[in-house]
């Protein structure tokens, strides 16, 4: 987490049986603290199997096995994201400060992950974004799986997700302020 404002404390939150994690930082802005929770939740694993499933010349048997393995992996990864979302929801509830919760959630707005973390917060895209915006650059650029959520005491001013190819995800840019 980079900030032009002083970072008072940082805590790393590691998830069991996962290489993913979240960072929690208390940032002092003027005379007020804001808790920033940056997340990287468990992947869908689609990219790991996509090459086998779509490669020309692969037999139907090999492709079918890859699809079956992908479905099993997606089920396991969804379970991991559920645990991660519950953990972050608990961190939000314990926070003595307004929160900004952001990052790669690897899940859609229809998911348990999205709704669990967003509960009681504002989705930056829904608040101040406009038009159609995706964050996952693959699978026909249909998916918004990276988010910025924030407490009611904060005010969104701008939100966008520029189409740049630094990653398989577009970055999310949100600008906001503390409400008067």
Regions found by a protein language model. Give the residues of each.
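Soluble or luminal CAZymes and related metallo-dependent hydrolases
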Residues: 15-17, 73-87
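Short, intrinsically disordered/low-complexity patches at protein termini
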Residues: 33, 58-60, 133-134, 180
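Structured beta-strand-rich core segments of catalytic domains in phosphoester-bond hydrolases
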Residues: 1-51, 160-164
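Metal-dependent phosphoester-hydrolase catalytic domains
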Residues: 82-83, 87-100, 105-180
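Phosphate-binding glycine-rich loops and adjacent basic patches that engage nucleotide phosphates
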Residues: 44-55, 75-79, 108-113
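Noncatalytic linker/hinge segments flanking ATPase motor cores
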Residues: 5, 30-31, 35-45, 67, ...
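Alpha-helix boundary/capping detector
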Residues: 28, 62-63, 143, 175
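A solvent-exposed, charged loop/short amphipathic helix patch at secondary-structure junctions
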Residues: 50-74
